[in-house]
């Protein structure tokens, strides 16, 4: 169901209004407490600037880290407020707490177009419990609600779901709208052929998404450590490679399901092996039916890359979630880099390429190809759940589009 978006609210509906905006500012910090990647802060700028430009009083709500419901001085949003202020070229006040007298006073002092960042909502255990009294206090600071935190949309928390019971309108921000447009669109109404590339080390973490994608895709390409569970299920020797013994039957079922549905399910034909799990390990390429004892697979091989590239060549929509190998080790990054390059080339030819959160995003950024993809999702778990066809509580709680 389409959700009402910020784009539907004009200046008259927003000028002078206090607008609570849930953002995803869960950014990485180094040991010195400096932000090492401000992508998530930048991703919220279109929504924030639109609101300030329309004369709204913008009250930002965010979580940072896992403080477990208590104040943790290392998880305050102070560096985030400073960076946001630099990006906006305007002051950003930060409250000492997300509710209470300091937050109320700073909000009361706001002029039209001002921005205030509320302190980490997860300093209160009530946030993750979606406790109604806490949600009501948070909502009492504002008159309008905008959710732009797609990365937290799969959680029914007070700041993502609870506050919508007390604020109307409750709408999607521009980042949320874009995420839903691409990810929901890829699942519900894609240009075909539709392919999914699923990687990562474990089948167990991708069961739901694999089952859903086999239902919806024309082709499913599997890479990463999970391939060895499929090979072992076929009766092949996998050496020291990672295998989930309790998922062998499931691997067989997934292959059978794809076959029954006429979906092309492709596994690598060769792998790059290592004698131990290290960046400087000895390596060799072997066919999947000739993996020697004592060796482990850490990447897809050169023949597999060609097979995957050929399979993707005619696709009009491609979703990628999870790397092809241990791309953190340069020696075992060729498969992941080749897929990133292939998708960049497909994008240039008009294919819709969607990077579905998590490690694939890091891989595309490491390859310097992020700008060439159609859409890079900011959500890890949220992206997976949406691709699985699950309802995201933070999305469901928003107003329906007129």
Curated annotation (Swiss-Prot):
Q: Which SUPFAM superfamilies match?
A: Phosphoglycerate kinase (SSF53748)
Biochemical pathway: Carbohydrate degradation; glycolysis; pyruvate from D-glyceraldehyde 3-phosphate: step 2/5
User: Which keywords does this chain's UniProt record carry?
Assistant: ATP-binding, Cytoplasm, Glycolysis, Kinase, Nucleotide-binding, Transferase
What does the UniProt entry say about where the protein is found?
Cytoplasm
- Mind telling me which GO cellular component terms the entry cites? cytosol
Q: Which Pfam families match?
A: PGK
Residues that bind ATP, according to the entry?
206, 297, 328, 357-360
Q: Which residues bind substrate?
A: 24-26, 40, 63-66, 122, 155
Reactions listed under catalytic activity? (2R)-3-phosphoglycerate + ATP = (2R)-3-phospho-glyceroyl phosphate + ADP
Q: Which molecular function term from Gene Ontology is one that the record holds?
A: ADP binding
Q: CDD domains annotated for this entry? A: Phosphoglycerate_kinase
User: What processes does the entry annotate via GO biological process terms?
Assistant: gluconeogenesis; glycolytic process
- The membrane spanning regions, by residue number, are none
InterPro entries hit by this protein: Phosphoglycerate_kinase (IPR001576), Phosphoglycerate_kinase_CS (IPR015911), Phosphoglycerate_kinase_N (IPR015824), Phosphoglycerate_kinase_sf (IPR036043)
E.C. number(s) listed in UniProt: 2.7.2.3
| Family classification | Belongs to the phosphoglycerate kinase family.
Subunit structure and binding partners: Monomer.
> What's the protein here called?
Phosphoglycerate kinase
